[in-house]
């Protein structure tokens, strides 16, 4: 919008408080809040003074016209909304104040915002004019784009306008703490100076330069009150204001006095603490400088002893002098003079090698008397510039920040400009300190730097050979890792991140491009005149313009201060739209240490403390700049969150107010922590801590008890330590009133030593806050260290001691020093430190034999207090040792943690950090002959007797006694240890054994149990049923489970929605029993099974055994007989072979019962359950004999491997209560968080793909207008229950693509924010299977579609707010949601209603009644699952027409059009489908199972003997109570949820033969006994062995044009505990199995007929619903049939006898069945039990029967 003059509009009425402000349209890549520098009206002191002394009426207010000033519009015109921030109500610069109004009133009456207070923009008088100012405080300013219309008509006008530009006035920040007042005052003084009020600021002598006016005093008071709230003022400021609330000048005067009170001593201490020497200056100059500082400090009473001085000097040595830093390890009494002798020797050797001069050694007398001073040759120079020169020559242009570059390429440019610098410009204003600071760019989107002297401009530099810019926003065609070296005048390297093109669009509509380098490490953006000259552009300082050689004016030049600038508005921005991840490669020497690594190294201290420590050199070896702090703000350490979780913090200021000031080590605080229970006797149960009041130095001592003599020993030790080490005497010890402190023995001891005990008063916990906070901090650190490292709990005090060492070395933010510095000790050298629990290999110098390994695995604890070694815990020796003979265990294999801390061990960084110390140790350490046998004096764990660990990764194979094949030895596994096992061993309770963990094998005879109703396809139903006998012991391999889902709504593993439909029951699946019924051998069984696997290309053979189908009554008509034959004809029923009696050998008949040992093995047995052992079997040798290594379940989980664990409290789990409690399977997280996918992902390729997915998701969110970008809300203004947390999750889909999704935390969403009655509907699996079956029979085309970001198309009705994504950097703001974000409770329902409406209204579809998400019209059928659509049509063009309509509204992607006549492969909702139109369809999950099953942490047997059935009959789950540890119980329940969840998902999809076993185990999720776990492993093993099986469908070849829908029903009477019956049904459409159901009967049946009636009654409703669906999708006639193997049930259904039943419940069911059968034209027929394929749904079957019933439909 073009700016308009004030004269075009009438004056605004006097009654308006504020007026609308117009603004110019800005470029799309420019911040709409940015204002051109030319829009700021010039202001000076003269005009201020003049305006303050005159009065002008509003009508006579004259404002000079300026085309760059925005003029007001009438009040009726609404203010424009150009950005995400609302326009503030403010008055324009050309608007006069209403008459009779003065903004100088009481402060509470001020109607304007704080940033309108500066007299820089309006004169301080009643008739002042208010300027336009950015609406967001602190928003950087920039110039408008060339399209905004702000062009210059000629060079003279441009010169006049631009030269009048003044710098902006930014308001000071708000004061938020009394401690921040000194820093705030500096910014406030600078604000006054920038507002041309510097003359009123008091000088050093306390007097201002000029007298302050009343208006200025009012302005001073008002701004001080607004920006410095009274509650955050220091006490001394409040005291001044209490006397005179307007005396701001006195506050400023006193603040300036405090700022000027920095003494020479403080400067000398800072200089001494930051010494740096590398030999670039003479050694005697360095010595003179240091000795002068030390002498001055000593003369002023600050004593610097030789030890401290040497440590400070050596810490600053670098280069060839660096090795002297470690001489303190060899010479503890070295003096400063001796140290400088070594420095002089090295320096003179260097000079001698350069100049061939003899070495020179100085005498100490020379050192004392030498008072020469040397100039530091590396001191940066500030070049004086002459801005008055107006020569047009290029060589005399303004010079600024000259740099030189060298490119490592054939065309080398090594221009070196002398007398130039990249140091900050010499500022006219001494308070503009921030302008010279080194800048670091955290993002690449900044178009401006608010700290620039002239923001939004480039500094013209005649000396720079290259153009440098800090922001990548304007860089085109950027490429990272440029091979370019850039140096300044002092030959210091400037790191370059990228190189690209800088494109200009000048006002004559010409475009020009020059090369530019990107670096954030310069003070200003530099534009090289040399590079401009190369493209025929010169700078004319006469006219102050950039022009071409022909005189064409391109852009004006701004003269600001002593330099010349050009606006950035002529730069064309690049197409960067979102922040990018900085992957700029740096060399080894410049690569920074990751913050999480330093965080873990320093005992998990917070970032603020670590930064203070590095700034103040309390941590040595590297500086603050060596750490990458980019992730410090948002980084959340999981171990800290777990270990340091607390309710609230202690009250601050807890020390007594009447406490006097003491010298160091005269006033101590002490407290005792403990006891820690369940530890071995050798480990301490308590610790006592001491804290010095003055220095905050801490000590900790272990205690085994709280007896008087134990406490007295500690007091004696610490008092002697303080007296000898610090030459101090303790005067007061503060403690609580515990009996350990108030006893007579300790009281007499303190009295004897002249120490005053200071006890806390009653109910005065605040007085003991120092000791309480220390104990809490140390305990938090202890929990965090143990959690992170995985070390056993008996090492808890080692974690306490490690934390104490680190805490004493970290600087306090308040005192800026560490406790060690206060105590006069040197800082902690971090290169000598290892992370707590770091895996190491310790050298064993005295092994048991010469061939015994020399390395012992161990875990580093903390540095030794008595040597230069390290305390290391050796689990194999059950002790800790003090040694230096260790090597850090490297690689990904050595990770200790359970939170996927792949990036937190940082082997490479650790090597760099400890390299120098390791080399020093290697060259200087004294070999200790008995190193490993010397235990630490505080090695309180040394004598702990540990039980040996159970073997890990032991593979065994059970061999049948009749099997001639010897067992596998598996030597490969014995040589290879699982990588995940390299972890600190957990503790194992020596008192826990199988006898008190495993339940007994007795079964209750009179149980009582209630029922749980079942749902389709098994899973969650309680089944107190025996499980089948396991087949054979499988070889085991350890693995981890990390399933990858297909998407975030439906995955190929399982989801919460789908498990609600997958509750499939099972019958007796395994277990143990004292008696085992003999079975036929495997070989004989195989001979008796007739395999009839049908060919895929040919149609299945006709069933020729129809004579086995026995009708209930003879059909009276040929039609009924044909109907029966038609129903039976195409069913996949087994072909029964002719039977012959089986004779067993005589010895077998005499075989006594064999006691089973299956409950002690991993899979339930030591041999093949189908094999026989004869009495006459001969004994075998040890090699040939059957062996079994019993592997406990605990040894498979590497996280639970513990070397020692005290007795824990047991939890009793009752079977009935556990089974009752099972409601649903808890979904397992299959996605990655941001830190896992990107931040700490060491897989570079995968990380880049996730970054790309992240950017794609952010762009999609912005494109879909997901939230309101016009307004941002403060968190305090919004009801917390309407605020939804959000996060990014990442996932790798099955097709290999990487996915990122921004989701809401709906799991913690408040119920008031959504309608609980709304449902998120998805297509039922039976509907999908029915559609697929009809597609095969009718030669349909199948098209698969995907709608990207489907939920974002649905509007949200509720008022909800989310926190902005992290890249926006607005942590304290909220944005309002406009779309249904993924994860919200109502998002699924909103999307369903949206897409349903579109399909019906725009696509002409209608939803099938009773089957949600199934839509149809005359040609097309659609199955909808969230954003996946499956289209079925006989005409492919009909599908394409639907796709075209969908693309008009939604981003629709065609996954598979399905137009080929050959075999087409689909991945539909987790099913891997192979479909050849008109021939066959195969449904399986081989690829998915091959990927997921090995990750379940279950031992699989990929090459050994395969299981032939998921279980065997004859064994039962024990009913006894399960006594188990609490933690172990939770862990096993979690594992059961994971295993059964995946198995339920697979069984629900297509493995209907497993539903019985899945249902049974699912009911025992909360009863994870050893037996239940073994049976679950056996089921997973069978799924692995049969992962290649598929559900095979062939195209139906009917004799009649009818659809045949059949349900086969079966029930097992009383085969469940407590006389419950198992029922099962299988549903077939045109001979193809489309679904199955297995569950336990809800009522207790009293006969087999009642059980069968119950099963039939469960099948008929679903059969009728499927019939309706088939008729809607296919208009052919349908024949419905029901098959059961119960003649009595069929008789009752078909009978017309209405006599009373003996049981009213089943009588009601029977009568209902009669009505349903007769009313729905349902045919009921008998099927022989041997051919009833539903038998697999109700009971465990022998291998032969199981194969016979399933190999016709799944193989």
Curated annotation (Swiss-Prot):
It catalyses: DNA(n) + a 2'-deoxyribonucleoside 5'-triphosphate = DNA(n+1) + diphosphate; Endonucleolytic cleavage to 5'-phosphomonoester. GO terms for molecular function: aspartic-type endopeptidase activity; ATP binding; DNA binding; DNA-directed DNA polymerase activity; RNA binding; RNA-directed DNA polymerase activity; RNA-DNA hybrid ribonuclease activity; zinc ion binding. Keywords: Aspartyl protease, ATP-binding, Cytoplasm, DNA integration, DNA recombination, DNA-binding, DNA-directed DNA polymerase, Endonuclease, Hydrolase, Magnesium, Metal-binding, Multifunctional enzyme, Nuclease, Nucleotide-binding, Nucleotidyltransferase, Nucleus, Phosphoprotein, Protease, RNA-binding, RNA-directed DNA polymerase, Transferase, Transposable element, Transposition, Viral release from host cell, Virion maturation, Zinc, Zinc-finger. The record marks 401-402, 582-583, 1217-1218 as: Cleavage. Residues 1610-1752 form the RNase H Ty1/copia-type domain. Residues 1044-1053 have a biased composition (Basic and acidic residues). It is found in: Cytoplasm; Nucleus. Mg(2+) 3 binds at residues 1610, 1652, 1685. PROSITE patterns: ASP_PROTEASE, INTEGRASE. The active site is at residue 461. Residues 583-640 are annotated as: Integrase-type zinc finger-like. A motif (Bipartite nuclear localization signal) lies at residues 1178-1212. One of its GO terms (cellular component) is cytoplasm. Residues 1338-1476 form the Reverse transcriptase Ty1/copia-type domain. One of its GO terms (biological process) is viral translational frameshifting. Retrotransposons are mobile genetic entities that are able to replicate via an RNA intermediate and a reverse transcription step. In contrast to retroviruses, retrotransposons are non-infectious, lack an envelope and remain intracellular. Ty1 retrotransposons belong to the copia elements (pseudoviridae). This is Transposon Ty1-DR3 Gag-Pol polyprotein. It comes from Saccharomyces cerevisiae (strain ATCC 204508 / S288c) (Baker's yeast). The lineage of its organism: Eukaryota, Fungi, Dikarya, Ascomycota, Saccharomycotina. The gene is TY1B-DR3.
């Amino acid at each position: 919008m073009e700016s308009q003059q004030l004269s075009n509009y009438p004056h605004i009425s006097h009654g308006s408080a504020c007026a609308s402000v117009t603004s110019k349209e800005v470029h799309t890549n420019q911040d709409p809040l940015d204002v051109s520098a030319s829009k700021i009206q010039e202001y000076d002191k003269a005009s201020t003074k003049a305006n303050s002394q005159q009065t002008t009426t509003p009508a006579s207010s004259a404002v000079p016209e300026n085309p760059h000033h925005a003029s007001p519009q009438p009040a009726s015109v609404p203010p424009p909304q150009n950005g995400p921030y609302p326009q503030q109500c403010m008055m324009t610069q050309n608007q006069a104040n209403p008459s009779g109004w003065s903004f100088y009133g009481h402060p509470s009456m001020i109607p304007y915002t704080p940033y309108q207070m500066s007299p820089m923009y309006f004169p301080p008088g009643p008739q002042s004019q208010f300027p336009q100012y950015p609406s967001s405080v602190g928003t950087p300013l920039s110039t408008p784009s060339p399209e905004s219309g702000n062009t210059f008509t000629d060079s003279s006008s441009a010169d006049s306008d631009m030269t009048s530009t003044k710098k902006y006035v930014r308001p000071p920040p708000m004061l938020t703490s009394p401690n921040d007042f000194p820093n705030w005052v500096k910014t406030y003084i600078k604000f006054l100076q920038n507002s041309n009020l510097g003359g009123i600021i008091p000088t050093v002598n306390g007097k201002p330069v000029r007298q302050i006016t009343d208006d200025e005093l009012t302005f001073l008071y008002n701004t001080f009150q607004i920006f410095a709230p009274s509650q955050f003022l220091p006490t001394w400021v409040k005291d001044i204001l209490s006397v005179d609330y307007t005396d701001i000048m006195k506050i400023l005067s006193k603040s300036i006095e405090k700022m000027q009170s920095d003494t020479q001593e403080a400067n000398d201490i800072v200089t001494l603490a930051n010494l740096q020497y590398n030999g670039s200056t003479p050694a005697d100059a360095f010595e003179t400088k240091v000795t002068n500082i030390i002498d001055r400090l000593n003369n002023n009473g600050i004593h610097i002893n030789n030890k401290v001085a040497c440590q400070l000097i050596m810490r600053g040595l670098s280069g060839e002098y660096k090795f002297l830093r470690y001489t303190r390890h060899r010479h503890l009494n070295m003096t400063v003079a001796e140290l400088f002798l070594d420095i002089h020797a090295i320096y003179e050797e260097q000079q001698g090698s350069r100049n061939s001069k003899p070495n020179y050694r100085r005498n100490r007398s020379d050192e004392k008397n030498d008072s020469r001073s040397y100039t530091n040759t590396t001191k940066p120079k500030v070049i004086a510039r002459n801005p008055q020169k107006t020569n047009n020559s290029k060589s005399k242009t303004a010079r600024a920040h000259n740099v030189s570059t060298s490119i490592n390429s054939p065309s080398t440019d090594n221009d070196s400009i002398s007398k130039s610098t990249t140091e900050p410009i010499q500022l006219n204003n001494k308070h503009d300190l921030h302008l010279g600071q080194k800048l670091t760019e955290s993002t690449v989107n900044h178009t401006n730097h608010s700290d620039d002297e002239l923001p939004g401009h480039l500094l013209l530099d005649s000396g720079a050979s290259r153009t440098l810019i800090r922001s990548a926003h304007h860089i085109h065609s950027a490429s990272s890792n440029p091979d370019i070296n850039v140096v300044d005048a002092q030959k210091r390297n400037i790191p370059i991140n990228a190189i690209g093109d800088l494109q200009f669009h000048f006002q004559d509509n010409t475009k020009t491009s020059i090369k530019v380098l990107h670096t954030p490490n310069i003070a200003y953006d530099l534009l090289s005149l040399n590079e401009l000259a190369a493209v025929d552009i010169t700078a004319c300082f006469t006219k102050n313009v950039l022009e071409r050689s022909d005189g064409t004016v391109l852009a004006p030049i701004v003269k600001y201060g002593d330099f010349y600038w050009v606006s950035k508005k002529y730069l064309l921005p690049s197409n960067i739209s979102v922040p990018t991840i900085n992957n700029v490669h740096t060399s080894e020497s410049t690569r920074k240490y990751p913050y999480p690594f330093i965080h873990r190294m320093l005992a998990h201290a917070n970032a603020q403390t670590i930064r203070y420590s590095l700034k103040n050199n309390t941590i040595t070896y590297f500086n603050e700049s060596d750490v990458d702090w980019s992730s410090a703000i948002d980084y959340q350490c999981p171990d800290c969150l777990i270990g340091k979780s607390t309710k609230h913090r202690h009250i601050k200021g807890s020390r007594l107010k009447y406490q006097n000031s003491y010298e160091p080590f005269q006033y101590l605080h002490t407290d005792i922590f403990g006891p820690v229970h369940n530890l071995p006797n050798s480990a301490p149960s308590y610790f006592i801590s001491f804290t010095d009041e003055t220095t905050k130095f801490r000590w900790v001592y272990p205690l085994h008890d709280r007896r008087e003599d134990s406490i007295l020993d500690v007091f004696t030790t610490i008092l002697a330590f303080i007296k000898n080490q610090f030459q101090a005497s303790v005067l007061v010890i503060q403690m609580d009133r515990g009996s350990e402190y108030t006893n007579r023995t300790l009281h007499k001891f303190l009295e004897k030593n002249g120490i005053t005990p200071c006890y806390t008063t009653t109910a005065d916990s605040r007085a003991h806050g120092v000791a309480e906070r220390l104990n809490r901090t140390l305990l938090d650190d202890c929990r965090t260290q143990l959690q992170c490292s995985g070390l056993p709990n008996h090492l808890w005090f080692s974690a306490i001691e490690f934390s104490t060492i680190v805490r004493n070395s970290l600087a306090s933010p308040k005192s800026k020093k560490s406790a060690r510095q206060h105590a006069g000790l040197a800082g902690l050298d971090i290169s000598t430190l290892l992370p707590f629990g770091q895996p190491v290999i310790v050298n064993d110098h005295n092994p048991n034999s010469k061939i015994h390994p020399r390395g012992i695995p161990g875990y580093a604890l903390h540095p030794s207090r008595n040597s230069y070694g390290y305390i290391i815990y050796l689990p194999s020796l059950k002790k800790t040792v003090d040694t230096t003979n260790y090597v850090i265990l490297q690689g990904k294999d050595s990770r200790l943690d359970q939170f996927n801390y792949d990036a937190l061990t940082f082997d490479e960084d650790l090597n760099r950090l400890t390299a120098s110390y390791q080399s020093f140790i290697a060259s200087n350490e004294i070999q200790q002959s008995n190193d490993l046998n010397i235990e630490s004096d505080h090695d309180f764990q040394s004598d702990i007797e540990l039980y040996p660990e159970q073997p890990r990764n032991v593979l065994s194979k059970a061999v049948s006694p009749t099997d001639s094949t010897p067992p596998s030895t598996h030597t490969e596994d014995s040589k290879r240890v699982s990588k995940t096992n390299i972890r600190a061993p957990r503790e194992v309770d020596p008192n826990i054994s199988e006898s008190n963990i495993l339940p007994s094998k007795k079964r209750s005879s009179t149980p009582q149990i209630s029922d749980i109703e079942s749902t389709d396809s098994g899973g969650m139903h309680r089944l107190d049923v025996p499980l089948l006998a396991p087949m054979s012991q499988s070889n085991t391999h350890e693995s981890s489970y990390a399933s990858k889902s297909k998407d975030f709504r439906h995955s190929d593993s399982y989801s919460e929605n789908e498990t609600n439909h997958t509750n499939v029951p099972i019958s007796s699946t395994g277990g143990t029993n004292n008696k085992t019924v003999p079975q036929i051998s495997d070989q004989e069984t195989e001979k008796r099974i007739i395999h009839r696997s049908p060919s895929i290309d040919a149609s299945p053979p006709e069933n020729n055994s129809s004579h086995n189908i026995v009708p209930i009554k003879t059909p009276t008509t040929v039609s009924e007989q044909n109907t029966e034959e038609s129903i039976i004809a195409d069913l996949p029923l087994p072909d029964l072979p002719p039977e012959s009696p089986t004779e067993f050998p005589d010895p077998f008949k005499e075989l006594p019962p064999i006691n089973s040992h299956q409950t002690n093995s991993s899979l339930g047995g030591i041999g093949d359950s189908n094999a026989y052992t004869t009495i006459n079997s001969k004994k075998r040798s040890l090699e040939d004999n059957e062996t079994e290594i019993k592997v406990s379940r605990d040894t498979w989980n590497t996280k639970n491997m513990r070397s020692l664990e005290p007795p824990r409290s047991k939890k009793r789990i009752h079977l009935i209560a556990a089974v009752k409690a099972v409601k649903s399977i808890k979904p397992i997280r299959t996605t990655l968080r941001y830190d896992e996918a990107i931040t700490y992902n060491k897989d570079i390729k995968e990380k880049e793909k996730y970054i790309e997915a992240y950017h794609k998701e952010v762009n999609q969110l912005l494109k879909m207008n997901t939230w309101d970008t016009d307004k941002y809300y403060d968190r305090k203004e919004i009801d917390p229950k309407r605020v939804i947390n959000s996060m990014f999750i990442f996932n790798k889909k099955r097709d290999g693509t990487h996915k990122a999704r921004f989701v809401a935390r709906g799991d913690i969403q408040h119920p008031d924010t959504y309608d609980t009655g709304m449902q998120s509907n998805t297509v039922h699996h039976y509907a999908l299977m029915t559609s697929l079956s009809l597609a095969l029979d009718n030669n349909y085309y199948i098209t698969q579609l995907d709608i990207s970001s489907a939920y974002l198309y649905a509007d949200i009705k509720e008022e909800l707010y989310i926190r902005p994504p992290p890249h926006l950097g607005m942590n304290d703001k909220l944005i309002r949601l406009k779309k249904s974000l993924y994860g919200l409770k109502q998002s699924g329902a909103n999307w369903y209603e949206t897409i349903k409406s579109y399909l019906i209204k725009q696509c002409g579809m209608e939803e099938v009644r009773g089957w949600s998400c199934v839509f149809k019209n005359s040609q097309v059928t659609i199955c909808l699952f969230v954003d996946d659509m499956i289209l079925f049509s006989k005409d492919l063009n009909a599908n394409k027409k639907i796709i075209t309509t969908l693309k008009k509204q939604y981003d629709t992607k065609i996954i598979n059009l399905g137009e080929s006549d050959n075999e087409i492969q689909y991945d539909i909702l987790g099913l891997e489908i192979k479909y050849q139109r008109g021939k066959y369809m195969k449904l399986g999950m081989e690829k998915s199972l091959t990927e997921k099953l090995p990750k379940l942490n279950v031992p699989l047997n990929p090459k050994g003997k395969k299981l032939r059935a998921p279980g065997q009959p004859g064994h039962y789950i024990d009913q006894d109570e399960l006594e188990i540890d609490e933690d172990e119980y939770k862990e096993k329940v979690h594992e059961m949820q994971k295993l059964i969840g995946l198995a339920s998902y697979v069984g629900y999809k297509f493995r209907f033969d497993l539903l019985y076993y899945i249902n049974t185990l699912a009911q025992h999720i909360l009863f994870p006994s050893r037996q239940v776990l073994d049976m679950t492993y056996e089921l997973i093993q069978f799924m692995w062995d049969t992962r290649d099986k598929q559900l095979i469908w062939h195209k139906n070849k009917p004799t009649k044009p009818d659809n045949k829908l059949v349900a086969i029903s079966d029930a097992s009477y009383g085969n469940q505990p407590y006389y419950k019956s198992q029922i099962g049904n299988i549903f077939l459409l045109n001979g193809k199995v489309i679904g199955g159901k297995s569950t336990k009967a809800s009522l207790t049946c009293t006969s087999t007929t009642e059980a069968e009636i119950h099963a039939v009654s469960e099948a008929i409703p679903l059969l009728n619903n499927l019939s309706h669906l088939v008729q809607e999708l296919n208009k052919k006639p349908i024949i419905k049939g029901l098959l059961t193997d119960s003649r009595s049930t069929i008789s009752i259904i078909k009978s017309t006898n209405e006599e009373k039943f003996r049981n009213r419940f089943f009588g009601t069911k029977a009568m209902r069945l009669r009505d349903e059968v007769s009313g729905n034209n349902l045919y009921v027929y008998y099927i022989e039990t041997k051919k009833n394929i539903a038998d697999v749904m109700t009971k465990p079957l022998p291998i032969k029967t199981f194969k016979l019933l399933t190999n016709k439909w799944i193989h």
